[in-house]
Structures are given as structure tokens and as C-alpha cells.
Amino acid sequence: MAEGVVSFGVQKLWALLNRESERLNGIDEQVDGLKRQLRGLQSLLKDADAKKHGSDRVRNFLEDVKDLVFDAEDIIESYVLNKLRGEGKGVKNHVRRLACFLTDRHKVASDIEGITKRISKVIGEMQSLGIQQQIIDGGRSLSLQDIQREIRQTFPNSSESDLVGVEQSVEELVGPMVEIDNIQVVSISGMGGIGKTTLARQIFHHDLVRRHFDGFAWVCVSQQFTQKHVWQRILQELRPHDGEILQMDEYTIQGKLFQLLETGRYLVVLDDVWKEEDWDRIKEVFPRKRGWKMLLTSRNEGVGLHADPTCLSFRARILNPKESWKLFERIVPRRNETEYEEMEAIGKEMVTYCGGLPLAVKVLGGLLANKHTASEWKRVSENIGAQIVGKSCLDDNSLNSVYRILSLSYEDLPTDLKHCFLYLAHFPEDYKIKTRTLYSYWAAEGIYDGLTILDSGEDYLEELVRRNLVIAEKSNLSWRLKLCQMHDMMREVCISKAKVENFLQIIKVPTSTSTIIAQSPSRSRRLTVHSGKAFHILGHKKKVRSLLVLGLKEDLWIQSASRFQSLPLLRVLDLSSVKFEGGKLPSSIGGLIHLRFLSLHQAVVSHLPSTIRNLKLMLYLNLHVAIGVPVHVPNVLKEMLELRYLSLPLDMHDKTKLELGDLVNLEYLWCFSTQHSSVTDLLRMTKLRFFGVSFSERCTFENLSSSLRQFRKLETLSFIYSRKTYMVDYVGEFVLDFIHLKKLSLGVHLSKIPDQHQLPPHIAHIYLLFCHMEEDPMPILEKLLHLKSVELRRKAFIGRRMVCSKGGFPQLRALQISEQSELEEWIVEEGSMPCLRDLIIHSCEKLEELPDGLKYVTSLKELKIEGMKREWKEKLVGEDYYKVQHIPDVQFFNCDDEQRE
């Protein structure tokens, strides 16, 4: 558990020492001594990894090592950064700088020697206490494999007394299993405890399945297995009366099994396959010739797709509230009639906490089954948050079984993914995490593999999603993950792990017993503030590396610059929505020289100090502050050469001039203003993927186009509307032929939409607002073959008639027509928009009626009508009902009153 975090820290420190070797000259001897100790530590960590469970001494050892590694990294990086600040200062200060440098070097050498001695002492104490022998021999502590073997035993037995919510899933999978020959592998994935094995059992014993196949085998693979054992079990299941199987060698078993599967119709269930590599180890016995079929369960969706890219991949779903309560009532039948209503209310609250996880509901039911009064239930409810994932003080092993099963998914993670997972403990319950921000948090912590931050972070998140540790739905319209969050149960596991690791401290005004504060808060290097009223509790925590202020529901004012001075080692600082006294960001922010991430998103600030020039390591800088007064931004951002993400204020002082040409590593640049920066600054920003620009009077698209041509990797382009936005009008040079561009927003004046050949060939999403187009844009837009969504917002089109032609918009999924004040008639021809699923009509006061041709758009699933005349609703539930009768979900908002059809 902790060793993952510690190993990650050692790897980062080692990389830092190698990367900055030239700047560490003069203290070579001390650095070499530190490296020798790190080698020893790394070997010990490898030993500890296999035998760490059940030993407080091992955990304490790892915690000491983690502190030492962090301290060493802080010392080295501070020295390097201070040395960088002294370079290029001119001759005048040379002598003074030299004296300071010699003093710094002497101090750093002494500090490194101190760290080295501390490491040596820890190793010595470890040996004297016998911990090293325990690590090697294992003592009596349980290994992960022991725990795995103890709790993970599954059988094909069909007896399930508490089945709820699986009937539909069974029917969805049984059909393809017996009727579609081309489907050879069916994969069921989902988080631990969600009911994958239960669902597989029901399919395994279904009457249709039993009639269809000639033989059946069920094998639980789990984490620890041998190739021979799995093959042997399958063959035994298919040939139960063959007594010679146990005496066969591996080669013979492989041949017999291959021949058997090749000649008959057999169903093989591989339950709980953890890794793609596990499939690779056992796949040789499965012939290519079809006839046999496989049902595979895994926490990792990628395992099934790896086994067969054409497999039927099915995600087990959580129970809805009604199903959860139904399951709970089967386990805890009604007994106490006099207190039933009170107990029902308490019980439903606790069941909701289980988040639809069947195993959690069953465990909770088992805990309450022998408690017959409301007061007993209330006591359990008050402690359920901590107890359902912690070491239960109650004599009920089932609580620990839930924790251990869910924990196995965490234990299986590689070192860097463990770090990614633990970072999610920062966020409040049900918090929607913006993925792009999350990736930058990770990168600022050193979880960054050298690709772009976006690609690197997306790889990590998708792996966590595949392992069912994180929920992140990709909508039909998006090509990237936008938001993610944790299932409540998994979040509690995450927080529990972070607590054991001293990974972070959560600060908030205690409101319930579920509030979790890290053990030994003084050793925690990360803080997250969930309440503005708790901000003063920060105190002086000089070793803290990250501070996130999240989910503020009240005003948080920062009045004192000392807040920053007391946190000199910060790498991550998120002050979104914070208010600064006098609108000024304190100049002491410049002392946070280690800072990689700074967010002032929607913060109340109008003046940035020039001291931010000292933040040389900055990767992510969000200055998209709350709109109010123009913001003073000093021309020092050009010195942040490591920047990958930069979001500027939408409104800056008229005299602001920013030179950004040296920021060649930018992947994301938003609110770039042609008034405050030169378009020539863009020429070398060839890594940009997301770009938002606002025009000034002195710049037209033609001026900008030469720089835009350099953006060959661009995915999102936005011409941002503001009161200062100005464009003479559409010009013939308007060509946006970026092959990777998926999303285009136009907030500028155009008399007509550019022609089809002037727009990106693979564009998927177009948003138009304040364009004041006089010509109908639909004849052009409907020819874009890859277009999935179109939004026409405030005065995008000022004409009276709009037509969607037959055969147009072949892939369009979503259409929004909003605040088109002059639109009177909209015609939809039969055969237009054959894939449209979602339609929104909003505040088009002159639009007389819904198109008659909408009745031909049979793919429509949802229609929202908002801010329209009352007659619209009356007609659509009356004489015009034929236009919408095929749409499952029709909603009216602010047309009179809300109504759902």
C-alpha cells in the first residue's frame, strides 16, 4: 500500500538528481552518498512490496522513508531554483550573488549529508528491530495473495437467494450467447461487489444456455494462478469422470483441451480475470475455430476486449434506489411494527450510502439483521461511513470483507496509478471533477510520462475507468472524457487508503462523524479545504506540497499574505472562487518557487503582482477570474517557459501588453487577445490543441490566419465573443482546414457561414452565436458529414426561414436552436437528420410551430422546449401531437408550467 507512494517518490528524486546533475556540481560527493542510500532503499522497498500486509513496523518504516525522500527533493529543488534565479543578473550583483551562492551550497551540502545520515539510521534501526528479516521471510503477516485466496472463492452454484435487478441484464446477454454465432466472447466488467459473478452464474445456469451447449466449465482465475491449474480445472469440468487429468503434464492437458474445444459446443466461464497478461498466459488452449464460447468477468473492461476485440462487452450496472431497498428488505425483513417508519427512514438513508452496490447492500443488511430497534439502527447509521471501509469495531467479518474486496482493485494498481487514485481523495462527495484540471494536478505532482499532459492524463484516467475505480461517462457527442467522479463506496476506500498513507489532510468544519482527517496531520503533505470557514485552520505547515480549495458554498476572503509565506514548498495551489482583499493577489505568491499549478478560476482578483515571474516551473496557470473590473496582468508570463496550460482574463486593462512568443510548450491557450498580444507570438506554439481568441478592432481573421496555419494539432478553436469583439465581416480567406479540429465556436460577425471546403473536414461540433448571419447556415452545415452537434445561440442567424434538406446532417445527434429572435419558419424535409437524438428549442419567440417533417425523424429520443409561447404546448399535446408522438421524452420549460410527456 504505502510502498507504491514511497517508490514513486524515490523514482522522482532519482530522476531529479540525474536531470540537474550539472547544477549540482560542487556538492557531487554529497549527491553520490545520497544516491547510494537511495539504491539501498529501492531494494528494500521491492522486498517490502511483497510482504507488507499485517505489519505496523513495515508501514512505519515506509512512512519514515517517504518523509526522508520528500525532504531530500525539497532541498535539491530549492537549491536548483535559487541558483536559476541568480543567473543572468548582471555584473553589479555578481559578488553579492557569489557570496550567497557559496553560503547556499555549503548549507545544501550539509542538509544532504543530514538526509543521508537519517536514511542510514532508519536502515540501521530496521535491521536492529528485525524488520528486514520480516520483510524477507514474511513472518506471520498475510500477503496480498493470502488475502486474495481467503476472500476470493467463487463457484458456479446457481443458488442466489437475494437476486434483484439482474433479470434484464440476464436476458440481454443470454440471447447473443445462444443465438449469434459471431459472438465468441462475452465480457462482464464492473467494480468489485457490483454483481459480475452473480450475473455470470445466472447466465451459466439459464435454461436456454443449458440446452444450447454440450458442456460447461467454470474457473475462478483471480490474481494468483498457474497456467496448468486453469487448464486442468477447465478439462476437469468438461470431462468430470476422467481420473487421469491430475496426472497429466501441462503439454498433454493443453493438447487434450484444445482438441475438445475444437470439436464441440462448450461454454467456459473465466471468473475474475485481472489483467490482460493473464489472458495471454492461458489463451493457447482456445482454438480459432468457433463453436465454444467464453463468458469472462473482470474489474478491467480492457481484459475482454484484449481477449477478443469483437467481444460483446457488458458493464454490470448498479442497483437503482428502489432495487437497493428491495434487496435490503429481503435480507432484513420487517419485524418492529411500532418503530417501522423511523427504521425505514434510517435504513433507506444507509442503503443510499451504499450507492447501488449489491455487495454493500448485502453487507449492510447482514449487519442490521439482528438489530431490532430504531436506536440501534441510528447508532450504526452514525458510524456507517467509517465502518463500512474501516477495521470494524463490531464483531462482523462481513464489513471487513467489503473493504478488502474493494481494496484489491487498489492493490493491483501500478505505482503511478496508485498515486493517481489516491489524489481523488481530495474531492468532496459527488464532486464532478474536470478531467483537464485533474490531469494538470497529476502532472504538477510529477505523474507525467513525457507525452502531452492531456494524453498522459487521459491514459491514466482511462485505465482507472477500465478498472472500474472511477466513473467517467463519455457522451455521444464528446470524443474526450470531460468529467469524472468516484462511486461513493470507492471514494470511501480511497479516503481510507489516503488516511493510512498520510497522503492528505481534509480540512472542514466537522458536520458529521463521517468527516475523515488524516492520521498524523503534521506528516501530511497535501491539504484540501472543503469549507471556507476552515481556511484559518491551515496554520504554519511548511512542508505542505498541495492546497486545494474545493466546493466552496460560502465566501472565502484571503486577507493576509502570510498565508502563502507559511506554505513555501507548494507545488499545487487551487484558489478557485476565492476572494482577495482589495482585489490584489499578494506579492508573496512569488515566493512559492516550486509552484507548478495555480488556479484563480472565478476568483475575485483584479491585480496580479510582478513577483509571479519567479514561478519558473509553472505548468498550469488559470487566470480566468470572475468578470467584474479589468485585470492588471504584468508582462512576466513570458518567463514561465514550462507552461502547458494558460487561461487569461477575458477583460484586461487596455494598456496591458503580453509577450507570449516563448511559451512554445503550450497545449492550451484560452482568451488570447489580439488587442493585448501580437498574433506573431503564436507562430511557434505548434503544440496547441485548444485555442480561444478574441479579436480587437485592429485585427481581422486574415491577419490571424497565417499564425493559425501552424496549429496542425488543433482540436478545439473558439473565436470568443466579448463586447470588444469586432470583425469587419466574412472574408474569402476564412479557411480552417485543420485535419484534427473537432470543435469550432464562432462568436464573430459573419454575413454567411463559410463554405463547406473552408471548414475543417472532420469537424464534429459547431457553436455559433452573435454571428448575425443573414443567409441560412443549414445548407452549408448539413453537408459536413462528421457533424454530431450544432448549436445556434443568440442571434447567430437573423433571417426568417431555415431549411434542413433531405439527406442532410447524416450523423447529427444533437441540435439546439436558441434565441433566434427573427426566425419565423423552420422546415425539416423527410430524410434529414436521420440520427438526431436530442433537440432543444429555446426562446425563439417568432417561430410559429414545430416543423411538420419532425415526424420523420424517428431517431429522436428527447425534445426540450423552453421559453416558447403557451400555444406551442397546447398544440403539441393536441392537433400537432402527431409530430412528436414518436419521441419518448418531451419536456416543456417556462412555456407556462413544466410538463413531461
Curated annotation (Swiss-Prot):
Top-level taxon of origin: Eukaryota
NB-ARC domain: residues covered: 144-453
GO biological process: defense response to other organism
Cited InterPro entries: Apaf_helical, LRR_dom_sf, LRR_R13L4/SHOC2-like, NB-ARC, P-loop_NTPase, RX-like_CC, Rx_N, WH-like_DNA-bd_sf
The LRR repeat ranges on this chain: 567-591, 592-615, 833-858
UniProt keyword Isomerase present: no
A Gene Ontology molecular function term of the record: ATP binding
Annotated ATP binding sites: 190-197, 385-392
UniProt entry keywords in alphabetical sequence: ATP-binding, Coiled coil, Leucine-rich repeat, Nucleotide-binding, Plant defense, Repeat
Coiled coil: 15-56
Keyword Coiled coil assigned: yes
Pfam families: LRR_14 (PF23598), NB-ARC (PF00931), Rx_N (PF18052), WH_DRP (PF23559)
Function: Disease resistance protein.
Domain notes: The LRR repeats probably act as specificity determinant of pathogen recognition.
Family designation: Belongs to the disease resistance NB-LRR family. RPP8/HRT subfamily.
Protein known as: Disease resistance RPP8-like protein 3
Classification of source organism: Eukaryota, Viridiplantae, Streptophyta, Embryophyta, Tracheophyta
